[in-house]
From Swiss-Prot:
Protein's recorded name: UPF0739 protein C1orf74 homolog
Pfam families for the chain: DUF4504 (PF14953)
Transmembrane annotation, as ranges: none
Family: Belongs to the UPF0739 family.
Domain of life: Eukaryota
Amino acid sequence: MSTPSPQLLVAAAQRTLGMGKRKCPPRATCLHLAGEVLAVARGLKPAVLYDCNSAGVLALQSYLEELQGLGFLKPGLHILEIGENNLIVSPEYTCQHLEQTLLGTVAFVDVSCSQPHPSVLSLDQLPGLKSLIADIITRFQELLKGVSPGVSYSKLHSSDWNLCTLFGILLGYPVSYTFDLNHGEGNCLTMTPLRVFTAQISWLSGQPPVPLYSFSVPESLFPPLRNFLSAWEKELRTRFRAQNAFADLSISSEVVTLPAVAL
């Protein structure tokens, strides 16, 4: 796959994602998005959540098809709609990631507001989530049986799911927050020291790095979560070495304490 000029990538995004009453994404946002989409296509992350503006499924399909027409992407990416959110997904890499999740490679941190401190859970303690992951794997396996030249689309109905937990899994985080929906969407992370992990890569010369991951874990739980985080970093570095579109993978962390944490 070739890398078109930045001007062509920006034009493709503004032409498809800024139609009608939607404001055109600025140049930096367009390049940021193209880099994240390419990272999904190259297997560095299973999905990216589209949050640049209110563009819907049809606009995103047009955008991805334009990138294919520029020789920037191969066919195979998928748009997954969950609630009012759209994710651009690699069915192949998402299947691999979810299959590993069922084997216990992802940890869960219960931050329900009904408890005084965050606590670690395993997937076996979340049977409903385990069943949902298996269903999503089946859905993507069906997609992989025949890749069409266009950009496919599907919708997951999410009336009783914890979207925070589900998005954490789909976006490839090694640790995902969860909480009891029966107690509202509050959490017990207020003024709790959090270790924030950030992974980014270099792409276009003269442009800021492309963010791959940004997630946090309670600092008090860092020791029991260390193995999950180390395995995630090892896997990411392995995938990074297998591609040649990006350079300079950087993974860092810092501890922050916030008066409120929105999930």
